[in-house]
């Protein structure tokens, strides 16, 4: 589970990211990211400053009719994000849209694709090539 401060869950927030955010694609995932205006909310280390980056995952029944399968994919993506959290810049709202081809992916592939998408969207600035597992 992602820390509460890093969760994007209001439907209006998802709509805003879809409407105004940039998008990047790989074969299994689509990333939509929106840089938020600077606000003085708490960030995870307790200091005042930019709002923490918030992450939402969207996976439709087109990916799988079985909720068990969809939830497993979401857990793998959340685990990959937990590993990438220290590298993320503050002040972003991110939505990951899962494509039906993601059924073939394992954790390492999700981690590599997420890192690649985040670098393309300039949410993180270094790319390790997936060697950080």
Tell me the role of every PLM-derived stretch.
Residues 1-133:
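Positively charged, solvent-exposed patches that mediate nucleic-acid binding
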């Amino acid at each position: 589970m992602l820390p509460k401060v890093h969760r994007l869950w209001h439907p209006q927030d998802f709509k805003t990211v879809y409407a105004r955010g940039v998008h990047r694609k790989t074969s299994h995932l689509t990333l939509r990211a929106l840089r938020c205006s600077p606000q003085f909310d708490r960030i995870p280390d307790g200091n005042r400053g930019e709002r923490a980056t918030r992450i939402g995952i969207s996976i439709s029944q087109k990916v799988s009719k079985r909720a068990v399968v969809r939830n497993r994919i979401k857990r793998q993506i959340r685990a990959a994000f937990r590993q990438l959290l220290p590298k993320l810049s503050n002040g972003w709202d991110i939505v990951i849209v899962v494509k039906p081809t993601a059924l073939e992916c394992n954790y390492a592939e999700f981690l590599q694709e997420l890192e690649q998408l985040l670098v393309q969207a300039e949410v993180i600035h270094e790319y390790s090539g997936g060697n950080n597992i």
